[in-house]
Amino acid sequence: MAPAVTGKAPPPASSPAPATHLSPAALPSQDRTCPPPAPARAPPPPSQAGGPQLCDAILPGVNPLVAGTAVTPIPDSPRPDYLVPTQDPAFRSCVVRVTDNQARQQTEQTPYLRNDYSRRQAFNADSSRFLLEDTAGFWHVFDAHTGQPLQVLDNLTGDATRLAGDAEPFWHPTDPNRLYFLPTNGLGMQIFQLDLGTRTVTTVADMGPQIRQVWPDADMAYTKAEGSPSADGRYWCLMARHYDDAGSQPMRGVFTWDLQENRLVGTLAMDSAPDHVSMSPSGRYCVVSHEKASGPGTRAYNRTFSTPYNEQITAGYLQLHENSEHSDIAFNRQLQDAYVAIDYQSNTGDVFMHNLDTDRRTTLFPTYLDRTAFSIHVSGKAYARPGWALVTTYGEYHADAMDSVLPPEQRQWPHRKMFAVSLDEQPQVRTIAAIHPNVYQYEDEPHGTVNRDFTRMLFNSTWDGGSVNDMEVFMVAVPSDALDQPS
């Protein structure tokens, strides 16, 4: 049976289908429930920086990365063994399998581990740790140098589900031992901070009193699982909703919170709930992303939601796209915010960037190649490496045989890969790794994400497997100067 296409890739010249969300951990925010309590665990010692790392022996042979858009055949290769560094045979990067889900199932009957989403920054401030979620909704911290698990973020302050499900963990921008998180589904309208060494939780923002001055019956404040604060952690764009019951959370509006000054800086009333909201990396703009069927598509507002939008644009918002697609917001080389997304409605299915300062849209590359199409994820989280975004691709097929596996001889240059694309008028491409994504359900989509300096990446993959049960998480490493090599 052919793998299912569960993302948002339509056949050329047709409309996309929404992604399928299947497990409690993958369901849309308002539908997710807290996982059951888990036994207490003692915190391990902090990860030690500076020691040997998994890919030390391979990294000297990685450069240069394969540049350009020529079709490079992807050879068959066995799935890497657990925690054994492997060099990608076609693209030379270091690939390490950092989970052993099948062994976990055989010995512990525990949920599968997976990288949560491409828009979530999985790596902490110094890339010494990364974060995975299990399919029951608990979050796990791993040592990024060794790949070893460090701790499960449960039983915090005696509460088994304090940080669980849609708690939206965000790493602190400078302190590798801390992360922010929200109440599950934003219920309570607070922002918390966790110290990983002591497992102590502090409330850094109690937004409720100020939000209720605007919307008296608001109960929830969150991004709906797919947004991020600004790169420096100061500004947060969140949606406010009323909580009626498990099946009804009426929308009230969108707002910006200044965590440094602990105050509400702008609000916008809104009746229809967006797919998600996010602050731009600079903190200047709030991006509100609606599905076309339920709202006005994807728009950017300044953080005070005032008119004019900025000194160049007199309207009150910037229309970025007519729909909500797989996308992210990155820094370009000038440290301007760039919305990077795919336009399935365009004639060639273009991946594009839209400058949030200037309103300039630039095509990065087409995806409808020789009557094929595919799905993508975008990660713009390399804030310390401005001007690049990570793209992972999956679910490729031919328009004349949508339910069949695309034969290798029909594959196009982007298919089944992870690559960096530069955010330039004449974009460059650097292919990083083959990701072998046979996708069967939402949980095993790649959801590739990148660290702040574009040296480490995570992705999910069944590695050419026959079912979602083959899904594992892989870490990819490249040298710090990999994107600087001439094309």
What is the role of each PLM region?
Residues 111-120, 134-182:
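Blade-loop segments of beta-propeller domains
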Residues 155-244:
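Asp-box/WD-like beta-propeller blade repeats and closely related beta-sheet repeat scaffolds
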Residues 342-352, 362-437:
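Loop/turn-rich, solvent-exposed surfaces of beta-rich toroidal or solenoidal domains
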Residues 113-126, 161-176, 218-232, 276-282, ...:
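Structural signature of eukaryotic scaffold interfaces centered on beta-propeller domains
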Residues 444-487:
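Blade-level signature of beta-propeller repeat domains, shared across WD40, Kelch, NHL, RCC1
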Residues 132-133, 178-181, 236-239, 285-289, ...:
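Residue position within the beta-strands of beta-propeller blades
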Residues 62-77, 238-251, 291-297, 342-345, ...:
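Short, conserved, GDST-rich strand-edge loop motifs in beta-rich repeat architectures
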Residues 63-101:
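Blade/loop signatures of beta-propeller domains
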